[in-house]
């Protein structure tokens, strides 16, 4: 097979991040230097993000049967790289006090970003599976990076065992679909699996097993039980990546599969997804109400957010354009709000060897010690709650409009109810940072240069959330560029 210059340009973001991994590995082997490795990784991500300008100029490019580049893939690639960049910025101050090898953290993040980029452009079940594994496997190490601390090691082992089981279900489901369709390409599967044979036992079993695997990766009910424990045990920078990039890449490829293989989006499957959406929204919000640990709260709330996102998948058959816009706007808002929230946790916490702030009470009076981190955390909670003048509100509005447009009143009502429940715990977390501590421990905290840099990144996230919440037009224009024309079965 001959690769043309056009195809090479289309693969630029992927190639740049792969090159970054190679350079980081060689640098670690030559001489360990925390600052150099972090700078190399961040530079690689920035170059990969900039290369999307040239990729977009090409339009639609089929690089191989497995890798398809278009506006849709570019949009989700950008979100994945931004998540990786934020994780690197938050990890640097956290790792400064780490007593073991620091540099491998950045290499693992870069490998996971490769998986996310591959998922954004996946056009085939094989590349989908490779992308999911490339994204998931580095997370085992990232979650357990603070292995001297028992919760981190426990979380890593739990995630590894359950993720391995979920991957087995996913792979077996793909094998069953291949047995019926005779092809693993999304488009070819869409042509083979017509409405007449979608109810065949092999196809139903394959779709069901794939749904189990994907449900685990996306923390959807009833496969979400690992989420709060893993979020709590993982270091704050890893939590930022786990909450954003791992969800964005997988959701992007699932939506492409539903768009290009419409038979996979059957009425039966939509009913199951509807049940999962309602259960995820209710379970995530109700469980988050009782949480005193901030990271567990964000873990449960992520379950409800993926429930809201399922609405976009369910309405895909009725309004494909609106469904894609909804998912893209919601995920962009969720990315910046989650990055900002976990970044604020990383900045507000003590250095690694003194532990992280976990309880909500630990954040009481944060405004008087670290005012920027407190304001950012408060704004991020408001955005996650969907309060007006934040990007989170625009995302929720699109979800509700998509439900109304498709006459899914029961699902729309559940989104409104879930958002109302979520307001309670988000507002509680947003308000507590401004309350003074009773022990008068309200003196400003001493900060390092690296913490100031991480604070700056969280501040940028907050500005984006507010600016796009007030004036969402630039983001809406971007999402319109990132629309896939629906296939007709």
Curated annotation (Swiss-Prot):
EC class of the enzyme, as a word: translocase
Location(s), subcellular: Cell inner membrane
InterPro entries cross-referenced by the UniProt entry: NADH-Q_OxRdtase_suN/2 (IPR010096), ND/Mrp_TM (IPR001750)
A GO molecular-function annotation: NADH:ubiquinone reductase (non-electrogenic) activity
Catalyzed reaction equations: a quinone + NADH + 5 H(+)(in) = a quinol + NAD(+) + 4 H(+)(out)
Gene Ontology biological process: ATP synthesis coupled electron transport
One Gene Ontology cellular component: plasma membrane
HAMAP family: NDH1_NuoN_1
Function of the protein: NDH-1 shuttles electrons from NADH, via FMN and iron-sulfur (Fe-S) centers, to quinones in the respiratory chain. The immediate electron acceptor for the enzyme in this species is believed to be ubiquinone. Couples the redox reaction to proton translocation (for every two electrons transferred, four hydrogen ions are translocated across the cytoplasmic membrane), and thus conserves the redox energy in a proton gradient.
NCBIfam families: NDH_I_N, PRK05777.1-1
Family: Belongs to the complex I subunit 2 family.
Name of the protein in question: NADH-quinone oxidoreductase subunit N
């Amino acid at each position: 097979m001959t690769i043309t210059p056009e195809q090479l340009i289309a693969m630029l973001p992927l190639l740049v991040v792969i090159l970054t991994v190679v350079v980081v590995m060689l640098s670690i082997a030559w001489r360990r230097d925390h600052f150099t490795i972090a700078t190399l990784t961040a530079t690689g991500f920035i170059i990969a993000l900039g290369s999307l300008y040239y990729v977009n100029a090409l339009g639609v490019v089929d690089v191989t049967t497995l890798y398809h580049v278009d506006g849709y893939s570019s949009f989700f690639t950008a979100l994945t790289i931004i998540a990786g960049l934020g994780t690197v910025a938050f990890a640097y101050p956290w790792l400064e006090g780490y007593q073991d090898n620091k540099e491998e953290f950045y290499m693992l993040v870069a490998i996971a970003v490769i998986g996310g980029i591959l998922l954004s452009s996946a056009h085939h079940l094989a590349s989908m599976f490779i992308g999911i594994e490339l994204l998931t496997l580095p997370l085992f190490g990232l979650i357990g990076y603070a292995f001297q601390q028992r919760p981190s090691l426990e979380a890593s082992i739990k995630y590894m065992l359950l993720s391995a089981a979920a991957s087995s279900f996913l792979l077996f489901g793909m094998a069953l679909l291949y047995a019926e369709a005779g092809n693993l390409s999304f488009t070819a599967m869409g042509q083979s699996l017509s409405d007449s044979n979608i109810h065949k036992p092999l196809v139903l079993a394959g779709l069901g097993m794939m749904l189990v695997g994907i449900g685990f990766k996306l923390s959807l009910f009833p496969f979400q039980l690992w989420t709060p424990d893993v979020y709590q045990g993982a270091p704050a920078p890893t939590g930022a990546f786990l909450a954003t990039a791992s969800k964005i890449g997988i959701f992007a490829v699932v939506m492409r599969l539903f768009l290009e293989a419409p038979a996979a989006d059957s009425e039966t499957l939509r009913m199951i997804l509807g049940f999962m959406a309602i259960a995820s929204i209710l379970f995530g919000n109700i469980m988050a109400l009782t949480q005193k640990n901030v990271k567990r709260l964000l873990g449960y709330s992520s379950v409800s957010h993926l429930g809201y996102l399922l609405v976009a998948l369910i309405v895909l058959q009725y309004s494909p354009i609106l469904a894609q816009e909804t998912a893209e706007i919601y995920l962009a808002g969720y990315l910046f709000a989650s990055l900002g929230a976990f970044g604020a946790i990383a900045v507000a916490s003590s250095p690694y060897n003194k532990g992280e702030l976990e309880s909500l009470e630990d954040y009481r009076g944060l405004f008087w010690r670290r005012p920027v981190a407190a304001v950012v955390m408060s704004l991020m909670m408001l955005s996650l709650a969907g309060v007006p003048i934040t990007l989170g509100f625009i995302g929720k509005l699109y979800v509700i409009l998509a439900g109304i447009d498709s006459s899914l009143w029961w699902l729309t009502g559940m989104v409104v109810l879930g958002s109302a429940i979520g307001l309670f715990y988000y507002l509680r977390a947003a308000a507590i940072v401004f309350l003074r501590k009773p022990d008068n421990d309200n003196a400003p905290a001493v900060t390092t240069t690296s913490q100031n840099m991480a604070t700056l990144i969280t501040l940028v996230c907050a500005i984006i959330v507010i600016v796009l919440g007030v004036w969402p037009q630039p983001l809406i224009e971007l999402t319109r560029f990132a629309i896939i024309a629906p296939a007709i079965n």
